A protein has these predicted regions:
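Outer-membrane beta-barrel "beta-signal"
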Residues: 211-234
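Gram-negative (and chloroplast) outer-membrane scaffold detector with strong preference
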Residues: 72-164
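Solvent-exposed loop/turn segments connecting transmembrane beta-strands
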Residues: 57-67, 144, 204-215
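Residues on the lipid-exposed face of transmembrane beta-strands in outer-membrane beta-barrel proteins
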Residues: 53-57, 69-75, 88, 132-138, ...
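Outer-envelope beta-barrel architecture signal
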Residues: 43-51, 80-84, 144-150, 178, ...
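Extracellular loop and loop/strand-boundary signature of outer-membrane beta-barrel proteins
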Residues: 56-59, 118-123, 168-174, 201-206
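Structural signature of outer-membrane beta-barrel domains
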Residues: 58-60, 89-95, 155-161, 204-208, ...
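Short glycine/proline- and aromatic-enriched beta-strand/turn motifs that initiate or cap beta-hairpins
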Residues: 33-80, 223, 234
């Protein structure tokens, strides 16, 4: 009986040791995979390599369509096929009629009007937006002269509202804001030399107004970076 008990303990202990060994092996493989992934990221290749100017139409959920322009700096590759872009852009758009009507209704709901016969007319309102953003773009070469990319990034939006009826009032103060946004991009570059043509669709999710734009522009890639393949080390 004692020998049977000893044999059972031995088998149970053996199974436990095997299980621990398997878990340690899997855990070690996961750590090695994570270390291998992180080792692909490096700051060594980060340096200004190209400058881009773009212009195109933009529309949003609370504004009328207008034009937007931007300036972008390609800051090199932080990982294979992953580059960093720093950008600034600007637009100035009119409030849409529906957005202005909703805003007037919200103001009316907080105004004390005993006779209930007052009306609020804000008139034309414009909203300007200055954005600074950082994008990570995954670059997919399609040949020597064409590059496509997908990107995601974060932006800071400085907005300013203005209009003849609201300037200097609390309404203008309510429209002035600084907020964050999430960017998504898809685009292409065409050209094998220093000068390249760019085409990009960009969507922005942010508080107050979310926008979509289609921009075209030119990029100048200076010497030392034009022949460098995406993601290759120095």
């Amino acid at each position: 009986m004692l020998s049977a008990f000893t044999e059972a303990v031995r088998r149970s202990g053996g199974r436990a040791v095997c299980l621990v060994a398997i878990l340690l092996t899997v855990g070690r493989q996961d750590r090695l995979s994570a270390q291998g992934f992180l080792s692909q990221f490096s700051y060594d290749n980060l340096k200004p390599s190209a400058l881009q100017l773009d212009l195109g139409p933009v529309g949003g959920n609370n504004i009328r369509g207008t034009l937007t322009g931007g300036l972008r700096l390609d800051y090199g590759f932080i990982a294979p096929h992953v580059r960093v872009l720093l950008g600034v852009s600007y637009y100035k758009a009119d409030f849409s009629s529906a957005a202005r009507a909703r805003f007037e209704q919200r103001l009316k709901s907080v105004v004390i009007d005993p006779s209930a016969d007052d009306t609020i007319r804000l008139g034309p309102i414009t909203w300007s937006d200055v954005t600074g953003d950082v994008d990570l773009q995954y670059v997919l070469p399609q040949g020597r002269a064409v590059i496509t990319y997908l990107g995601i990034g974060l932006g800071a939006h400085i907005r300013h509202g203005s209009g003849p009826a609201i300037n200097g009032t609390f309404v203008q103060d309510a429209l002035n804001s600084i907020t964050a946004g999430l960017n998504g991009t898809i685009g292409a570059e065409v050209g094998a030399n220093r000068w390249r043509f760019t085409l990009e669709a960009r969507g922005v999710l942010s508080s107050g107004v979310s926008t979509g734009s289609l921009r075209s522009g030119v990029m100048y890639r200076w010497a030392g970076s034009r022949d460098k393949r995406p993601g290759t080390p120095k």
